Amino acid sequence: MASYALPEGFSDFDMFAFGSALLVGGLLGFFLNLISVVAFLRVREMQTPNNFFVFNLALADLGLNINGLVAAYASYLRYWPFGYEGCQIHGFQGMVSILAAISFLGAIAWDRYHQYCTKQKMFWSTSGTITCIIWGLAIFWAAMPLPAIGWGVFDFEPMKTCCTLDYTMGDRAYISYTVTITVLYLAFPIIVLQSSYSSIYAYFKKTHLFKALLFCWGPYTVMCVYACFENVTFISPKLRMLLPVLAKTSPIFHAVLYAYGNEFYRGGIWQFLTGHKSAEHKK
């Protein structure tokens, strides 16, 4: 059997520990979101234009869970077994899932604002159009670092068992791409979430939705933005690996907060799991 050298800064225990964290987080998020997806498909009462955003958020998170499980598998092997092309596919698929998920957070916030404040009804034509635009833009922006285009580069994380945007490049292409993505997919969604939920504070007297986004993606984004100005390789490889692992826990928070914590969605999940309508779903 071939022997592979461990990545610099990582021991066998580190590889096992990070792999286990990715495995546990990936499996938990996968099953939580899978139940959410199947419940939407099986329970007719759940199939509303509003819930369609939550359904698509779960689909995007399933993609990120699968991405993390692939990284967990490679971590247990101690090397990346899928070659250069596999790295590009892994980076692209993960980026599509991330960008789509964050976009659907903004779409759900916008929908709830109109649901509670303007009392405007959501139509399938509107929900479907927004969903197509979100997925289309996610694919478009995620494709930019692919070799055929070359705006940014997908490469290995420090542990060499998963692929993402290479933040160690620090060149003009990386800087312009990172700034663009940060503005479009972090700053803008944060503004939408903050303004929408502030307007309906009487109904949502909690800030968990906003805090979850910052907790999962804030540290990783700070490092990527910092890499636009300084070389980040001085940061410990373990810390640089910890940040994307933390970001990959976002599907768990999304499932709990947006599906299982949603009064318009959890009743359908309960009905799917038990065969009985919940009290709030009967109202």
Regions found by a protein language model. Give the residues of each.
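Loop architecture of class A 7-transmembrane GPCRs
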Residues: 2-7, 79-95, 127-131, 140-187
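Seventh transmembrane helix
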Residues: 215-225, 241-283
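Class A (rhodopsin-like) GPCR signature focused on the TM5-ICL3 interface and adjacent 7TM helical core
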Residues: 104-116, 145-157, 179-227, 257-259
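Cytoplasm-facing ends of alpha-helical transmembrane segments in multi-pass membrane proteins
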Residues: 30-41, 65-69, 96-119, 131-132, ...
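Extracellular/periplasmic helix-loop-helix junctions in multi-pass membrane proteins
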Residues: 225-239
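Extracellular TM2-ECL1-early TM3 structural module of rhodopsin-like
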Residues: 11-20, 49-108, 114-122
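Alpha-helical transmembrane segments of multi-pass membrane proteins
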Residues: 26-29, 56-68, 130-142, 182-190, ...
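Extracellular N-terminal segment of 7TM GPCRs
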Residues: 1-31
